[in-house]
Amino acid sequence: MIEHYLSQALIGLTLAIATVLLFALAHWRSRPTLPLPPGPPSEFLLGHSRVIPKENAAAVYAKWSKEYNSDIIHVRSLGRSTVVLNSADVARDILDKKGANFCDRPRFTLLEVMGWGKTLTFLPFGQRWQMHRKFLQTSFSNTNVRRWHTLQITEARRTIQNILKKPETWETSLRRLAVAIVLQVSYGTQVLEDDDPYIQIANDAMYATGNGGVPANSIVDLVPFVRYLPDCIVRDWSLRFARQWRWAIKKLHDVPFAAAQAENVTHHLLREYKDKESRGQEQQWSLDDIKGAAGAVFIAGTDTTWATCVIFILNMVLHPEIQEKAQQELDAVIGSDRLPDFSDRPALVYIEHIVQEIYRWSPLAPLGIPHKSLHDDIYKGMLIPKGTSKAKVSLLLVQAN
């Protein structure tokens, strides 16, 4: 009996050693002939797994960029390379000028577990990605967005009235403003009160999405089959968090969609879907696709609008001299008997610059959604391997410099 267990243990040990050796051989054979971008020291087999930041990643990558005197940083974890772009110039060179090679996305398994499926931001390059992208580009072209100007003006003035009535709830009023505009555009549904249930739906979805870890960098992203294992085996907080908060993403997709009214960006998709369904024709858009497209608009517009308004107010409080100059420009352009509208925007140059400075001073998403390369690429003598994820630190170092 003892000999049997010893034999089984020896076989297991042999297989483990063989696996490690094969992995090491594959790693050695895959070594690039050109240098990779600089980065922190790596460990054998593990690479940078133990140093890749799980929290406040943008600040850590910015620190490494200064430490290694490079606007492009490379890290590797369990065989997957990630290149971090730390300046606007490098981002333009790689993501814009070479966009055809870097248009793909890595698979976001963790976000799939959370409920983000057919949403453009997280889709890999392919037919579905092209379909979603074309729809959103058409819906929000420079011409089409003008039809929402009246809605934006109405909601902005309603927000001002709410703040005048209850100045202590100004932040909640701004949250309602953001949700009201995006929900009307996406689903044709009105949000009139500061305590509307849709505001909590948006808050829950944003919390779930923003607090589950760095996209494409969790254990389940690196080893996708882990998603099928129970928490007692995996013991990964990000996977457990995604499972616990899946309800919030499902609610974001299902509740507004069920109450959708006419005259919104997804209305014609739903109408086309029902027409084809009644005729028994093949569907290009599934219901999940339509929900995903509407959800992408909802999640992208809600938090960014609210955060920009809050940061604007913060800066006006901190810099009253800037606020005074902005007020002087408003008085000069529109006087004191009316409120501004979109026709006044070209003349409000100083206020436009304030808004642009807010974008620069406090980027709303310091760490952008990763891209993935379709083929090997060479940038300034450095190799970016095929399948590499690119995370762009949005203007983080530009503001620091």
Each model region followed by its residue ranges:
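Cytochrome P450 catalytic-domain helical core, especially the substrate-recognition surface
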Residues: 41-62, 81, 108-187, 200-258, ...
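Cytochrome P450 core scaffold surrounding the K-helix E-X-X-R motif
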Residues: 91-96, 192, 397-401
